[in-house]
């Protein structure tokens, strides 16, 4: 039985779920997304969110409030008489009156294995911490931050060199299918929600710019996890002399260097060890696989080396 759905989401991660719900035949009465943002060199252009663009393509009404705390916005939401609200990376706080408005409440697609990595940046934090698995969960929303009971989950292995971008793309596809299944089971009253475990709670705080500079004194595994957890955005970076000028280089992909003992003395941390962009860390080394110069496009390390004279003995700072 089709449900009357309010969809709430903003970034590209949310789009496959919106598309899948529409394809499954549910009635999407409105889409809530964050307002268009200033873009362009002078900030004079307003760019709609990826979800807004998709909703307009599907012919669905779009609403872009800056807050849902006002009585007028809450009344407008309630007037939709929705069966359920589906929330995927919306970005605004939902007051209790909003959570309680739909007949079946609000459910959320969250990209972690709760209660690990509640909060804003679960994909990045999982990789930065060296986790071996992640996943998508559908949970019933309540006032606490990602504290609600879980209805469905699907696990996903985190491969050794997988970046946050890779995991993002995998989980957004998994999440779309999982949400369609959740709605189908809710319509039949066959979906059971189970309280999260009290143990193992961690928080995925938003990534801060101060975290993005690489600390080469850390062990190679930690540096590798740091790089891939921040790739492609905002991107971990370090500086190196290119043509007599210190240049900031984004480090987008790496791998742990083979054949090196973590305890082996490789010299100064940040030092270039060979002609393949192998870099010494506090213990062990990593090999850079993909980098990006300021103002340039991402490039394979081999391509970058053809245009930049980086040789053994040079050093990242």
Curated annotation (Swiss-Prot):
Give the UniProt keywords, A-Z.
Protein biosynthesis, Transferase
Documented EC number(s) = 2.1.2.9
State what protein this is by name: Methionyl-tRNA formyltransferase
Q: Which GO terms describe its cellular component?
A: cytosol
Keyword presence, Transferase: yes
| InterPro entries in UniProt | Fmt (IPR005794), Formyl_trans_C (IPR005793), Formyl_transf_N (IPR002376), Formyl_transf_N_sf (IPR036477), Formyl_transferase-like_C_sf (IPR011034), Met-tRNA-FMT_C (IPR044135), Met-tRNA-FMT_N (IPR041711)
Q: Which family does it belong to?
A: Belongs to the Fmt family.
Q: Which Gene3D superfamilies match?
A: 3.40.50.12230
